[in-house]
């Protein structure tokens, strides 16, 4: 991979979000709450119970000729649309123009910026239009989507709240019965597209051995059945879970590449594509011999407005940037 180029701007790194703390509560509620999430997790695993919703049956997608993936958008519609246009996914009106392409967005559409509603509406519209054209949109949950379902608003901007009509209206819309809450609770946390694993943070072997269908079923079940306060106790949404884990992006490659290989072997996959950890250089980060690619390049203006997308066609992997394309693997 070529040396990183300097970004157009040099914003000061923002504090990395931390997993939401467990909320203090009376000991009886702590027992019932924490135990509820724990028992639900282990009952699902032990008895292979599929409570609603049933997982997406085509979590492994074998048909696409072209895959495009884009990382964290964080409330910035203008830069998000610019990246989608640059990658040949949408036109200036936000309409699907990618034909049979499979487009994956790896989560964190919300927080840090004001354009939450516009961005989720864009994803809805592109999803519908892609199907008509023979393509597919795969939107995945990020930690910030789940934080908002937990009613953890540490990174929500005043402009975002105002766009929903106030905090209480925002809570209602994000809730299990709100239009946005219902929509997001159908999203998966992990997808396998032709042997490339896509997710937000990173899939540690601890979770990879569960299998993708189980992870997606558990996530959707928790989000559709547990109240916000109980989501804090779900191990899947914890610091080493698929939404929060940063090891593949940050840890010493001499150690973490072995961990990555174990996870990929468990899934019979050859590559992992993740977001979550901003690359303020504006360049896609390749590690472990191109077996993991970090595509959070700081698209939102709060991180510098760096624009990049990942394109995979067969064995050829390319970073798509403004005015240039750089081959990562072939």
Which residue ranges define each predicted feature?
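Feature recognizes metal-dependent phosphohydrolase scaffolds
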Residues: 2-330
